[in-house]
Amino acid sequence: MTNVYSFDGILVFGLLFICTCAYLKKVPRLNSWLLSEKKGVWGVFYKAAVIGTRLHVVVAASCLCMAFYLIFLK
């Protein structure tokens, strides 16, 4: 279990947020509803989805490294 207020927790939350937004970008109904706004508070979801789709290899490698760290080293 990771604590949200630690650096590990922030990294896990960020990776999960980026992965979730990238997945929601592939769902047509949610894409038009959630990711249509590119500015403001709702723009954070759009920007995370863009990061997740453009850097999918880096995000996947980061998720694997974080999973290895949390399971075996922490």
Curated annotation (Swiss-Prot):
Pfam name, any one: DUF1242
Regions crossing the membrane: 53-73
Recorded topology in the membrane: Single-pass type I membrane protein
Primary location recorded for the protein, binned into one broad class: Golgi
Keyword Zinc: no
Cleavable signal peptide: 1-22
Cytoplasmic membrane side: 74
Recorded GO CC terms: Golgi membrane
Keywords: Golgi apparatus, Membrane, Signal, Transmembrane, Transmembrane helix
Extracellular compartment segments: 23-52
Keyword Nucleotide-binding found: no
Compartments reported by the entry: Golgi apparatus membrane
Family: Belongs to the KISH family.
Protein task: Involved in the early part of the secretory pathway.
Protein name in the entry: Protein kish-B
Lineage per the UniProt record: Eukaryota, Metazoa, Chordata, Craniata, Vertebrata
Gene: tmem167b
